[in-house]
């Protein structure tokens, strides 16, 4: 089975790259058994990232070699198969590998790290932690220690322990010493990891100077503040350097923070939102979130805002042109999906647009238009990825009848099957009803069990004392439901003997309002959601807790849209950066944000569990590669430069060799 390349998280890709550093050459006597031209060919394939070909060659040469070279080459082949995405090939070699000699600790350590990395890929964090013991000593070569700490960083991150993940990255940074290129990548990932923590957590846990971690945490807080003016950020960084004068942060890294902030600034922003019609309340929530973020900037640095009514679809292009004539340097909106589609058809777009929705056709593209929305499709795909990482293979799908349920089910199914998972059964329920026993029985094959028992009773001519059984081949249920229906569906699934099946669902299951009594029936459900909704922090002026005092609506059904409004404002200074640097992410209220090659913004969300009626964060979605959907409708020359033949990978800079 080949691992889909999108399954590689940023840190795990870093681990695989570090294998190249940690693949220690055999001693001279062992190396002499391998012809120089063969070693040269293997190294060339590895340098060119032709991992599949390199792994096949290594395995072939190993089969023709004698011990101890045979074992060394088999191990390198197993590592390279995993780089190529072929876990089963790697495992088949691991199972027959033993250290060629008892006095080769490096071989045994590499084998243990490889087993760990496979456990991480499978989502078996407990096994991965067991394999990490014992930790390497000072005598262990630095490349192997780097690999160990990269593994630990990923294990902690997937467990939701971002601070400990950052500590491991800090150790890696110190171990790299004079390798400035790799240190820049590690430092970027370190600050991004800390920036995903809440402001409250950063402030409470930050140690004072001269602590290295304290310095990184303060830098992360500066990054999160979204300081608008480069001069102000330069002053803040200078003050930071005075406080942490011996901190290992590279000057090149600090300079990169300044460069990003200076990439884009607009003094005049036009906001296109409907002021009447069915989307008025949605628009109001987005607008209020946008304004809340705008008010956080000092008065002298706030851009001019001008609002335009976009209620009438037919006026979309005229309103855009009117905004430009009145001096707009950036346009935010429209909200209507059809209006976004109209703008995408424009041949010339003089000023950039941050649209507040995403069109159905994922390949429609304009280099000056960015699409941002709370797409349930992103959630469905991340659920598929999480379930796969946790080792599940057989899925059941239960969604409401209608367009919304169809779209979510289809996106989950496509992503799940792309990863290699199987959909055993897919059923729909009528959301206007309260009794869902019929679709549930079909989903769980209980209706077939009933039919078999009735047929047997007819054959025997007597009533049988038997219990209907649900199917036993399913690993989990993917469920899409609004809060009220979710509270009805979960007990009914339990009644039909599915209480032990894990249930994964989208954010729609959670109202966003803490209600232990009503949500008690949602026990043992895992879902993805906006971090801002789940994190209870008081130190940040833009936290939900603080904004709710000023805007009561923040606590209602449109809460996630306030977060979207905040991110919409803060994104404006980062769009060019995200476009120019594929793989870059920024920490937002709606999640960790990144841009794909079609200028569609994606969100990496928080994972939460419902226990005793209360939602609590358990971790964060893995940083996957950016999805690609074929060629854009615009000419290829209009696309931003991307690696790998234009296929933008959603990998942090730390993953680049």
What label would you give each PLM region?
Residues 449-451, 472-474, 490-566:
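Extracellular/periplasmic periplasmic-binding protein-like sensory domains
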Residues 147, 159, 163-265, 324:
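Extended repeat-based interaction scaffolds and adjacent low-complexity, acidic/S/T/P-biased segments
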Residues 330-428:
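Extracytoplasmic ligand/sensor domains, especially the bilobed periplasmic-binding protein
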Residues 546-617:
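Segments of small-molecule ligand-sensing domains
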Residues 516-517, 589-657:
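Solvent-exposed, acidic/polar segments of extracytosolic/periplasmic ligand-binding ectodomains
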Residues 106, 281-286, 296, 300-362:
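Beta-alpha junction/loop-to-helix N-cap segments that form part of ligand/metal-binding clefts
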Residues 18-37:
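Bacterial Sec signal peptide processing site at the extreme N-terminus
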């Amino acid at each position: 089975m080949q691992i889909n390349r999108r399954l590689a998280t940023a840190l795990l890709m870093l681990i695989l790259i570090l294998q190249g550093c940690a693949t220690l050459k055999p001693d001279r006597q062992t190396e002499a058994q391998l012809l120089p031209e063969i070693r040269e060919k293997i190294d060339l394939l590895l340098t060119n990232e032709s991992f599949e070909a390199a792994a096949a060659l290594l395995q072939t040469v190993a089969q023709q070699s004698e011990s101890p070279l045979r074992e060394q080459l088999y191990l390198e082949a197993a590592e390279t198969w995993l780089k190529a995405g072929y876990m089963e090939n790697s495992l088949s070699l691991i199972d027959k590998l033993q250290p060629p000699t008892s006095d080769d600790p490096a071989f045994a350590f590499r084998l243990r790290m490889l087993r760990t990395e496979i456990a991480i890929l499978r989502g078996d964090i407990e096994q991965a932690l067991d394999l990490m013991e014992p930790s390497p000593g000072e005598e262990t070569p630095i490349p192997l220690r780097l690999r160990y700490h990269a593994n630990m960083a990923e294990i902690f991150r997937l467990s939701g322990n971002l601070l400990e993940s950052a500590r491991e990255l800090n150790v890696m940074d110190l171990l790299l010493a004079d390798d400035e290129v790799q240190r820049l990548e590690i430092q970027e990932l370190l600050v991004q990891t800390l920036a995903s923590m809440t402001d409250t957590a950063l402030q409470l846990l930050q140690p004072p100077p001269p602590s290295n971690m304290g310095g990184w945490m303060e830098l992360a807080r500066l990054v999160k503040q979204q300081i608008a003016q480069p001069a102000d950020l330069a002053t803040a960084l200078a003050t930071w350097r005075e406080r942490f004068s011996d901190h290992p942060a590279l000057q090149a890294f600090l300079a990169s923070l300044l460069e990003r902030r200076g990439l884009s600034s607009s003094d005049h922003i036009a906001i296109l939102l409907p002021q009447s019609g069915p989307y008025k309340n949605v628009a109001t929530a987005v607008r209020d979130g946008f304004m809340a973020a705008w008010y956080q900037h000092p008065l002298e640095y706030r851009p001019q805002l001008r609002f335009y009514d976009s209620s009438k679809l037919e006026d979309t292009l005229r309103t855009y042109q009117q905004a430009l004539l009145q001096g707009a340097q950036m346009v935010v909106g429209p909200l209507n999906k059809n209006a976004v589609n109209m703008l995408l058809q424009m041949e010339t777009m003089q000023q950039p647009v941050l649209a507040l929705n995403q069109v159905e056709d994922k390949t429609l593209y304009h280099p000056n238009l960015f699409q941002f929305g709370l797409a349930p499709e992103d959630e469905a795909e991340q659920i598929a990825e999480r379930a796969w990482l946790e080792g599940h293979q057989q899925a059941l799908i239960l969604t409401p009848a209608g367009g919304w349920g169809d779209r979510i089910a289809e996106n989950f199914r496509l992503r799940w099957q792309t990863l290699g998972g199987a959909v055993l059964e897919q059923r729909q329920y009528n959301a206007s009803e309260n009794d869902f026993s019929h679709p549930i029985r079909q989903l769980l094959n209980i209706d077939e069990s009933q039919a078999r028992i009735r047929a047997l009773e007819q054959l025997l001519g007597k009533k049988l004392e038997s219990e209907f059984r649900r199917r036993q081949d399913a690993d989990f249920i993917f469920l899409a439901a609004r809060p009220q229906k979710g509270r009805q569906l979960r007990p009914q699934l339990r009644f039909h003997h599915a209480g032990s099946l894990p249930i994964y669902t989208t954010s729609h299951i959670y109202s966003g309002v803490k209600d232990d009594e009503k949500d008690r029936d949602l026990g043992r459900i895992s879902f993805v959601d906006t971090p801002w909704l789940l994190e209870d922090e008081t130190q940040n002026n833009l936290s939900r807790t603080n904004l709710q005092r000023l805007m009561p609506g923040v606590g209602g059904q449109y809460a996630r849209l306030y977060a979207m409004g905040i991110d919409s404002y803060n994104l404006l200074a980062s769009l060019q950066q995200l476009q120019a640097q594929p793989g870059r992410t920024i920490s937002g209220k709606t999640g960790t944000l990144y841009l794909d090659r079609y200028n569609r913004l994606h969100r990496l969300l928080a994972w939460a569990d419902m226990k005793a009626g209360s939602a609590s964060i358990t971790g964060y979605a893995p940083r996957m590669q950016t999805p690609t959907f074929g060629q854009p409708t615009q000419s290829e020359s209009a696309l931003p430069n991307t690696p790998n033949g234009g296929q933008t990978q959603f990998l942090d800079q730390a993953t680049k060799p």
